[in-house]
Amino acid sequence: MFLEKEQDNLDNLKTQTKELHKDYTECQNCQKEETQTTNKDNQKEDETFKNQPNKTKQTNTKQQKHLSKESSHQQITKLQTQIKELQQKLSQQKKTFDEGLLKNQAEFINFKKRAQTQKENELKYASSNFINNLLMPLEQLEKVIDMPTQNELLQKYLLGFKLLQKQIKKVLQDEGVEEIEALNKPFDPTFHHALETVCDFEKPDKTNLAVLQKGYLYKKRILRPTLVKVNEWSDKNEKNE
């Protein structure tokens, strides 16, 4: 829609420029016609007064020529002023048209770059939803593997599940999936989401004391933040006491 609107504006500028050029040409033609008419009138005046007495003829001829010259001069001056105004308008319209054209070209180039970047990102992160949906059953599998048991048969099954879990993690790592480090790390709202807070003056302030749910990066983009329990001193002065 934006490009269509800008194209309409450019078309309007072209139309206005053509109209101004047409007016300019008409004014030039009018000036030529006025000059020709003045010359013809002077010739007619000379023929009209040929047969009159010399003094009267000379006086009238001088007066007529003087008036004719003044009228012609005024008309020419007026036309020259109009031509100058039209030239200025034409120059301004051309400048506006050129600036609009350059602006549209720059915006179109930027639009192509944004569209290309968006397309590349869509391809790059096309598997985001699939991987995110895969993480939940993978974490459930980890909980099953970590379950303590004395049953030898069950332990063999759990060993097989553990090998499967490692293979899945390896595939995810190869695709660019990374686990966000959070335990005992300073709380960072960019990567961590605090579900619980505790106050323990034996531990550093604003530190993650426990991971409630693992967080992951996918090709350096946050796939989901880590849910943590954060140590937050309710009164820092109390520790000094």
UniProtKB/Swiss-Prot annotation:
Subunit structure: Homodimer.
Tagged with keyword Chaperone: yes
Listed Low complexity bias regions: 50-62
GO CC terms: cytoplasm
Entries under SUPFAM superfamilies matching the protein: Coiled-coil domain of nucleotide exchange factor GrpE, Head domain of nucleotide exchange factor GrpE
InterPro entries: GrpE, GrpE_coiled_coil, GrpE_head
Gene3D superfamilies, alphabetized: 3.90.20.20, Head domain of nucleotide exchange factor GrpE
Keyword hit for Phosphoprotein: no
Region (Disordered): 28-78
Regions of compositional bias (Basic and acidic residues) in chain numbering: 28-49
Subcellular location: Cytoplasm
Taxonomy, superkingdom: Bacteria
Family: Belongs to the GrpE family.
Gene Ontology MF terms: adenyl-nucleotide exchange factor activity; protein homodimerization activity; protein-folding chaperone binding; unfolded protein binding
Organism, as annotated: Aster yellows witches'-broom phytoplasma (strain AYWB)
A GO BP entry: protein folding
General function of this protein: Participates actively in the response to hyperosmotic and heat shock by preventing the aggregation of stress-denatured proteins, in association with DnaK and GrpE. It is the nucleotide exchange factor for DnaK and may function as a thermosensor. Unfolded proteins bind initially to DnaJ; upon interaction with the DnaJ-bound protein, DnaK hydrolyzes its bound ATP, resulting in the formation of a stable complex. GrpE releases ADP from DnaK; ATP binding to DnaK triggers the release of the substrate protein, thus completing the reaction cycle.
Entry keyword set: Chaperone, Cytoplasm, Stress response
Name of the protein in its database record: Protein GrpE
